[in-house]
Structures are given as C-alpha cells and as structure tokens.
Amino acid sequence: MSEAEVPPVARGQAALLGPAEVRALAEEFGVRPTKQLGQNFVHDANTVRRIVATAGVGREDTVLEVGPGLGSLTLALLDVVDKVIAVEIDPNLAARLPVTVADRAPELADRLTVVGADAMRVKPSEIPGEPTALVANLPYNVAVPVLLHLFSELPSLRTALVMVQAEVADRLAASPGSKIYGVPSVKANFFGAVRRAGAVGRAVFWPVPKVESGLVRIDRYAEPPWPVDDAHRRRVFAVIDAAFAQRRKTLRAALGGWAGSPAEAERRLLEAGIAPSARGETLDAAAFVRLAATQP
C-alpha cells in the first residue's frame, strides 16, 4: 500500500488537550475568552478526533483551520495530515500556538504554519500554498461570513467541515421551502452540497456556551453547474439578498428595487421560469443563478 493509499489514521504523536491542559494554557498565556472574538475552546480529545474523522482529511490534504485558539483541534489535525495552516486573529494566541505544538507534538511542529490575520478579510496572498480542506471551530459570531469569504477567495478548497452554533448549522443545511431556509442556505449551496454532519454538546467547551453546536459539511461541486467567478457570484448574491430582505413579500414585490420596478421584476422572473407570486424561500441556488442571468 502506497503512502497516498494509507487511510487517515492518527499517528498518535500529538498529546491532545484535556480540560486541565486547556485551563493551564489559558492561565499561562494570560488568555481570557472573549465574546467579542467568539472564543469557546474545545477541551475534549474525543470531540476533536471525531471532527477530524468526520472531515475525512488525509495525508495529502493541506488543511486550513480558522480560530485555532489554544490548539485543541490543531493538534488532532497534525496527527493526521501533513500540513495545517492556522489563521488566528488574536496576536497572543497566534504567537503561542507554535510553542504549544512544539511542546506537545515536537515531531509534527514543522507541519504547522500560523497566519496572524482576520479570517473575514484574509487574502489568498496571505495563505501559503493551496489549502484543500477547511476544518475549524468557527467563531460563532462571524461563522457564516467567514465560511462564505473563504469559499469565495480560495478556489482550492474542496471541502469544509466546520463547527458552528446549532441554529446556524440548521440554517446552512436547510432545504428550499423550510422556515429556516434563507440567505446562508442559498449562498452556501452556490459553492457546493451542504449537509448536517453531527451535533456537539455544550460540555466539551470552556467556557461553556449557552447554545448547542453542530457540524456542517460542504463539498464543493467538482464540476460547477454555473460560473463561479467573483463578478458572477456578486450578481447572484445581490439577487439573493434582495429576495430575502422582505421574505414575506412575493418576489415581484421584493425584487422591485433590484430590478428597477415590480413590473420589470416580473418580466425577469418569467424569463427565468419563476412564478412572480413565489417567495424567496422556495427557490434553490440554481433558480437564483437563472434570475441573475436576466440582468442586463
């Protein structure tokens, strides 16, 4: 069996973090989790192992991690893949992460690259190499914008397995017609197939959050069914935003501002094969793409 065929089994070379280690590191580094940065650190080794296993990443993957914090998930990833790029907005945590990895997984330390940046604004030029998978415990207050930004900016990303607030996970994976189907659902589906990939209880975090968490997986379309260039994406996203800004209204009324008038909105809707009396939550991503194509 070649190296490429070896299944993604942990090397067992990383000493994963437990509750005592997480608190000790936080005290040592002078870290106080803040709501502003959405910091809730995972302190359960079985949970991070499950996340890595569910992500399905292997040796050949270059994994992008956002918000590595104290390094719980980072260590579990390094035990399976050959390269991890961690993007951390907190300068203190960004500086300390390599120290933690060198201490707890010295044989794997050279596989980690830390980028001190805001994941909502990070540019491809700041990311070394071409990451193939996003695996992260995303800061809950910015999870959706970060996810969409990274899929927009990094075409090399083939998959994502992210932990987010359970309610957000449900919205991302919602289907047309659902009460919780909305802007995040459609925009995520613009890039790929989205599905719920599990639940995560509150007890595995420090501090303990007030909400439950969930895992969401996105698999980018191998052959995109529509153009994915930035200009086209912006046109499609503008229609999505307009349709859901007044979600109780018919699309004829809701898209009046986008089209210039309700009458013009009706004309474009009919051209795209969509009933003017329909509402935004009934349309899938393909319908919004057709609608955007009617714009002169």
From Swiss-Prot:
It catalyses: adenosine(1518)/adenosine(1519) in 16S rRNA + 4 S-adenosyl-L-methionine = N(6)-dimethyladenosine(1518)/N(6)-dimethyladenosine(1519) in 16S rRNA + 4 S-adenosyl-L-homocysteine + 4 H(+). This is Ribosomal RNA small subunit methyltransferase A. It comes from Rhodococcus jostii (strain RHA1). Keywords: Cytoplasm, Methyltransferase, RNA-binding, rRNA processing, S-adenosyl-L-methionine, Transferase. It is found in: Cytoplasm. Its main location: cytoplasm. The gene is rsmA. Belongs to the class I-like SAM-binding methyltransferase superfamily. rRNA adenine N(6)-methyltransferase family. RsmA subfamily. Its EC number is 2.1.1.182. It comes from the Bacteria. InterPro entries: KsgA/Erm, rRNA_Ade_diMease-like_C, rRNA_Ade_Mease_Trfase_CS, rRNA_Ade_methylase_Trfase_N, rRNA_adenine_dimethylase, SAM-dependent_MTases_sf. One of its GO terms (cellular component) is cytosol. GO terms for molecular function: 16S rRNA (adenine(1518)-N(6)/adenine(1519)-N(6))-dimethyltransferase activity; RNA binding. S-adenosyl-L-methionine binds at N40, V42, G67, E88, D118, N137. Specifically dimethylates two adjacent adenosines (A1518 and A1519) in the loop of a conserved hairpin near the 3'-end of 16S rRNA in the 30S particle. May play a critical role in biogenesis of 30S subunits.
